[in-house]
UniProtKB/Swiss-Prot annotation:
It comes from the Bacteria. SUPFAM superfamilies: C-terminal UvrC-binding domain of UvrB (SSF46600), GIY-YIG endonuclease (SSF82771), RuvA domain 2-like (SSF47781). The gene is uvrC. Belongs to the UvrC family. This is UvrABC system protein C. The UvrABC repair system catalyzes the recognition and processing of DNA lesions. UvrC both incises the 5' and 3' sides of the lesion. The N-terminal half is responsible for the 3' incision and the C-terminal half is responsible for the 5' incision. Residues 12-91 form the GIY-YIG domain. Interacts with UvrB in an incision complex. The keyword DNA damage applies. It comes from Carboxydothermus hydrogenoformans (strain ATCC BAA-161 / DSM 6008 / Z-2901). Keywords: Cytoplasm, DNA damage, DNA excision, DNA repair, Excision nuclease, SOS response. It holds the Pfam family UvrC_RNaseH_dom. Residues 200-235 form the UVR domain.
Amino acid sequence: MTLWEKVKNLPDSPGVYLYKDEKGEVIYVGKAKNLKNRVRSYFQPPEKLLPKTRVMMEKARDIEVIITSTEVEALILEQNLIKRYRPRYNILLKDDKSYPYLKITGEEFPRLLITRRVVNDGGRYFGPYPDAGALNETYKLLRSIFKFRTCTPTIFAQKKRPCLNFHIKKCSAPCAGEISREEYFKEIEMVVDFLEGRGENLIKKLKKEMAIASDNLEFERAAKLRDQILALEKILAKQKISRGQRNADVVVVANRENLGVGLIFVIRQGNLLGQKVYTFTGEMETGELLNQVLVTHYGEAKEVPVEIILSTRENLDEEFLNSWFELKFGKKPKFTVPKRGEKFELLKMALENVNFTLDEKIKLNEKKQLLNEKALMDLKEALNLPVVPRRIEGYDISHLAGTGTVASMVVFIDGEPVKGKYRRFAIRSAANDDYTAMFEAVLRRFKKYLALQEEGGADGSFEELPDLVLIDGGKGQLNAAMDALKETNLLGKFTVIALAKEQEEIFLPGKKDSLLLTQDREGLKLLQRVRDEAHRFARGYQEKKRVKTLASLLEQVEGIGPKRRKQLLNKFGSIKNLREATVEEITAVPGITREIAERLKELLEME
């Protein structure tokens, strides 16, 4: 599905959109009152866009959206996602408008400030707050309750006597020693408790302290605590109980047409930090899918929230999940299925997002299936095949300067890779001869097929014949594969071709001239995907084998333990590089003495 096709399917809801580049990295985060209208505005003739926006859109390859209930939700989520991803074009494109935060400075006697800039300066930040007016009101009340200082560091350093703020009971005058650092920090800790949503707990704590002060006849302190409690209760009475005062995850699923999607909203300290999406294929009941999503997500997580909000508990394996959570985290979350209130609103928002994501993925799958079918029919016609090539196998050879030669076999069915059927072969014959290596790989693959036919048994990789075999290379590699098939008496049972990378020439057996398909042909694009996947798979195996060989050699050298072995592997990467390195270059690795380096060089010369 193209970017524009995705945009056409966007809803008219408020939400956040994330542009991604070809690597899948988030390059821009924006918010919208109407997602469809806002995102469409980027698709104008380039000359109508700002230069920076034009550059950003040239890089954009994909878009993800998170639907929110209100524009305010979108504002908060946008800020959190920008902090999380640090997208490069937000730094360039974001307008000067930003949302205010409360900041507790990292000074000896901290201040509480309202700021629109978040920097790594040792301070603690709370927010963002989309309603600046309400924030100013809260700030004034907090200042009247806790009496923290507001003066600049320069003025604070010069003060020897309390200023007017102390006399009108708006500052505790730490500059003049009217309050100890310990007592001042207790006040700041209470501010933190309040800002982190623990206002009720703070009031309970203050009431206990007030009772103790009263019992000890400390009436002045008890009166101060009483005033703080009354002011805090006034603030809390005005506040709507919000999800901002809890850590929770909302976990929802949707499934249709052999496709399942799980979505998690992560809410921490009052902020919706974003969503995590999981996709599953195959027939699955809703309860089974929900269990799978929970185990998959929390299997990777470092923490579990106090509460997990669900749309249903039907078929939820709570006994197993509770045991599993206890074992992994030492505690179990509370599962809730809200029917009304704020939690229900959150749940509705998550369900809207998961259904939108599922619809989008189904459309993408349908488009992919159509393109794959078009590519397969194109190949049948272009290569004059007797059947549509439902099963295509791709082969490639990889080695490093003639050593550690490996071959890969990848399998595509109906145009899609089936990774469970991939296989790799460590080449035993002439290591630095690509033709001999290709001959061996193809011969071994089809001998396995014949053995299965004769002896019975099952092997998803080898028990079926392909409709088409694609060899990475030119005529030489193609001829080697054909020779291998002659030995197995399978020649003519299916079609074999080679694809040479430089000109993307297709070589066919017995044909003098190569075949060239235009770059826009879906058939050629599919062949390129198969070839590139075979190449990637071979290189990955060859790399693992090379590192394993080097690690094995390093184990033989006295004085090189696991830590030094890892350092040498990271620095040199191969026996060839290590052999070419000087003793001085080897001793540059921490912990490698000249004596150890010389022993290693001696062993390398014997190899």
